[in-house]
């Protein structure tokens, strides 16, 4: 290096550990329409000022590192750095704050949830200056969301494909989740679909195990689909789980499903990964397959209130990465989900424009600029007595999925499906007539049971079943 170059490079450089606040805490910054905005719930270590902690989050999730480096002078940090532009204390909590960070759009690769998450929720979550950190929400600007595939088809196209309108769709996860042979599995699928369900589902655990290889399962399920369609005159579907150990194997399974004439495949998007999910979404769009998404592993990431990623962020990421359905919890069943929080991210999945509403945990106004919506799937510990509440909470654009609530019927699988179909149609009719499902729900089910022995038997079996636990994640 020449002396002249050494002198020029040394101008303005001061080695040492950074005070993040000096560069990355910018309370006067006015956010741009193209910025990606993040709301972090942060718990600093004792003695760490919230401004320093928020600035550290902005730095470590964008251009910063722990010390000043020579190469800072070779780029424009003001153009590329994240900025902590606001900090507010969390009501009722000691030493806990919401830090708002703005990221310039050029930090992220177009159409890549993988790159987005690698930056925003990467190493910063292990930062020693923070006792805990949780990403509560993201604002995705239209300039960025338009670079993503989004759902392969969306709600309206799915309705048109199925020719089913004006009610929630009904599903069932085949149980036991592991251990059935392919032929017995196909039999259960046929009985449920013949009884009146719209969909049946592979459990997320079912891939290709020694007791049931994927190709055998696909073949027997396809036979069940065509037989039930011929008998009922309705279009039926089964979520064939294409999740596999490699992307190549996953796509091979999706190709086989399409060749069999199946209308929908499934993917475990968190365990499978966003890159695999987006690849599958592209295939599904190009080949007319619907894509059902299971969220296995989500509670490891989102259930703790102070650390991790809220599911509303994972839901937004899925809408961008691609999926036509995603599991969202039930509010009333066995799985975690408070009503207002759940409806907040359900709207973020389905609607085109969602206003900021802190009462539902929505930190930013989100404009999806006509990106297709995703059907929320309510699944987990639900049965016929829950039908009025589920219909009232989730509305028509949803899938209500009863596994044990179908297959646990005392008379068998088909009567279990009949009970659920009668219950949902009774609830929809009552709602359309102006009745209040929240207050009259049990009466509506009892009235319908007088004309359906299958529903009456289901009501008797599950009349005492409740899951009354407080939600861990609350506002």
Curated annotation (Swiss-Prot):
Its cofactor is Mg(2+). Residues 1-2 form a propeptide. Pfam families: RuBisCO_large, RuBisCO_large_N. Binds 1 Mg(2+) ion per subunit. The disulfide bond which can form in the large chain dimeric partners within the hexadecamer appears to be associated with oxidative stress and protein turnover. It catalyses: 2 (2R)-3-phosphoglycerate + 2 H(+) = D-ribulose 1,5-bisphosphate + CO2 + H2O; D-ribulose 1,5-bisphosphate + O2 = 2-phosphoglycolate + (2R)-3-phosphoglycerate + 2 H(+). The modification N6-carboxylysine is found at residue 201. GO terms for biological process: photorespiration; reductive pentose-phosphate cycle. InterPro entries: RuBisCO, RuBisCo_large_chain_AS, RuBisCO_lsu_C, RuBisCO_lsu_C_sf, RuBisCO_lsu_fd_N, RuBisCO_lsu_N_sf, RuBisCO_lsuI. Mg(2+) binds at residues 201, 203-204. The active site is at residues 175, 294. The modification N6,N6,N6-trimethyllysine is found at residue 14. The record marks 334 as: Transition state stabilizer. It is found in: Plastid, Chloroplast. GO terms for cellular component: chloroplast. Its main location: plastid. Belongs to the RuBisCO large chain family. Type I subfamily. This is Ribulose bisphosphate carboxylase large chain. It comes from Equisetum arvense (Field horsetail).
